[in-house]
Amino acid sequence: MSQVYNFSAGPAMLPIQVLRQMQDELLEYEDVKASIMEISHRSTDFIAMAQKSEQDLRDLMNIPNHYKVLFLQGGASAQFSMVPINLLHGKTKANYAYTGHWSKKAIVEGSRYCDVNICTNSSDNKYTDIDVFENWDIDPDGAYLHYTPNETIAGLEFDYVPEVDMPLVADMSSSILSREVDVSKYGVIYAGAQKNIGIAGLTVVIVREDLMGSVVANQPILFDYTIQAKNDSMYNTPSTYSWYVASRVFEWLKQQGGLSVIAKINQTKAKTLYDVIDGSNFYSNPVALKYRSWMNVPFLLADENLNGLFVEKAAINNLITLKGHRSVGGMRASIYNAMPQKGINELINFMKVFEKENS
C-alpha cells in the first residue's frame, strides 16, 4: 500500500509506528491472551497500562505533583460545561477570550452557568489576528480566564500565555503535546484526544488540586473533577481502547526525544509550508504572521473555482482531507505530530505542480 498523508483536522493522522503496534496487538494485548478492548478496566493489566500512560504524560509535560491527570469522556465539548461547574466556586462571572469557532462554543456553554465577560474578540478581523494582552478587558471578579491557544478552523494560534491573577483555563485540543508547556501557569488544561493524543473517545484533563472540591449544585456526578480523581477516572467504564491508543502515542513521543524535539520538528514543518504559500501569488494565508498556527495551516487559492479540482487531484496523489472548513473556504492542512516532514514535502511538490498547471 502506498503511503497516504492524511491532513484531517481531527480525527487525525496517527504515527505509522503506533498504527502498526495497534495492528499487532489488536487480537492479543501483551500476554493477556485477549484484546485490550475485551478486558476489564478493573483488571491488573488494564490498570497497569492506565498508570503507565499517566506517568508517561506527566514525564512528557513535566506535570507538577499537585495536579491531577484525568482520562475522561465527552470530548472538549463536555469540558465547556465541566469547567464552570468545577471552577466557579460560588462566583457568578468568568472571563473568556473569543478568538474563533471553538472558543465561541465554550462561551455559549459557559453562559449557561455564569455571566461571561468576553475580554477580547477576534471576530471583527475574521479570526485572523489576536489583540495584545494589554488591551484585554479582564473582569477581576471573574472566577477564571478561559482561552483556546490554537483555533483549529482559522489556523490562529497564540504566541503568548495570558498572565492573570485567577485560574487560567486552556482548551489545548489541537496544540497539546506539540511543544513544551509550563503547566504551572494553568489551573486547568484539557484536550480531546483525536488530534495529538490518539483517537476519539478520550479527553485528557489536567487540573490543579486546589481548584477541586466545590461544584455547582445539582449537576451530573460524572462532571465532578473530584469524583473522577478519587476514582482514577474510572467512576464509570472508561473508553478503554482510546486510553490504550493514547498510551502508545505517549510512548512514541518519548521515543522521538520528547516535546523539545517534537517542537523543533513541528516548527520546521509549518515554516516549510508557510514559506511556499507566502512565496506564491497563487496561494495565500490571511492570518497575522505572529499568530499563525503550527498545527493547522489554511490557505486559499487565487481562483476558488479550482478548489474542487485541487482536492480531487491531491487525493489521487495520496494527499487526503485537505478541503478547508466551510466558514473559511479554500484548503486546510492539519499537520499534527504524526505528520512527517516527508508528507509536507509531498504536499509542497503537489502544490507547485498544481500552480504551474492552473496559473
From Swiss-Prot:
This is Phosphoserine aminotransferase. Gene3D superfamilies: Aspartate Aminotransferase, domain 1, Type I PLP-dependent aspartate aminotransferase-like (Major domain). It is found in: Cytoplasm. Keywords: Amino-acid biosynthesis, Aminotransferase, Cytoplasm, Pyridoxal phosphate, Pyridoxine biosynthesis, Serine biosynthesis, Transferase. Homodimer. Binds 1 pyridoxal phosphate per subunit. GO terms for molecular function: O-phospho-L-serine:2-oxoglutarate aminotransferase activity; pyridoxal phosphate binding. Belongs to the class-V pyridoxal-phosphate-dependent aminotransferase family. SerC subfamily. Catalyzes the reversible conversion of 3-phosphohydroxypyruvate to phosphoserine and of 3-hydroxy-2-oxo-4-phosphonooxybutanoate to phosphohydroxythreonine. Its EC number is 2.6.1.52. Pathway: Amino-acid biosynthesis; L-serine biosynthesis; L-serine from 3-phospho-D-glycerate: step 2/3; Cofactor biosynthesis; pyridoxine 5'-phosphate biosynthesis; pyridoxine 5'-phosphate from D-erythrose 4-phosphate: step 3/5. It comes from Vesicomyosocius okutanii subsp. Calyptogena okutanii (strain HA). Its cofactor is pyridoxal 5'-phosphate. It comes from the Bacteria. The modification N6-(pyridoxal phosphate)lysine is found at residue 195. It catalyses: O-phospho-L-serine + 2-oxoglutarate = 3-phosphooxypyruvate + L-glutamate; 4-(phosphooxy)-L-threonine + 2-oxoglutarate = (R)-3-hydroxy-2-oxo-4-phosphooxybutanoate + L-glutamate. Its main location: cytoplasm. SUPFAM superfamilies: PLP-dependent transferases (SSF53383). One of its GO terms (biological process) is L-serine biosynthetic process.
